[in-house]
Amino acid sequence: PDAYIEHFAYDKECFLDDFPREAKMQDVCKTLNSVGFSSPPSWLKPYAVLSNGEKMRCDLARAILSEKELFVFDEFTSVVDRNVAKIGSLAMQKAIRQSDNKKQFIAVTCHFDVIEWLQPDFIFNTNDMTFSLSSKKKDQTSLYQYTKYQQHKTSGNIGKCLANIII
């Protein structure tokens, strides 16, 4: 439940002031750039005046900079146009992969167009209740984790066998 990110509180004049205090400015800049928010003049604005795409990227960067190892974004790309959704998904995928397996990201979305950009390790489709390996991630680690999932799915103890990016 505490991994679920519904929204962050932003009440400062510059949204950067709401980022984790322990985060170094170099890491903040690197993370904002890694999620595709590469406009330093916009970094000085209040969160409320950002575009939906900038808000999405800001929230993603803040989640990455948080101490949480697992975070879940519901309606991951629903408030942005589809091109921004794809670009944001690619940027997020790269940022998570660069975390050296320190972060896990679960994207909850009804939009299938982001799958090839997000390149999740696993996909759970609620339309037909199927759980599958992403076609691009069929490496040994993912196969091992998927096998563990198959063995433990009836026990309800599957949280530890998942990988970095799940959709």
Can you say where each PLM-predicted feature lies in the sequence?
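ABC ATPase nucleotide-binding domain signature region
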Residues: P1-G36, E116-W117
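Non-catalytic substrate-recognition and accessory regions of acyl/acetyltransferase enzymes
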Residues: K138-I167
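Helical segment within the ABC ATPase nucleotide-binding domain
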Residues: R82-N101
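C-terminal lobe/lid and adjacent interdomain/linker elements of RecA-like ASCE P-loop ATPase modules
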Residues: K102-Q104, H111-Y146
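Loop/turn-to-beta-strand initiation segments
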Residues: K68-L70, Q98-I106
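Walker B catalytic motif
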Residues: V72-V84
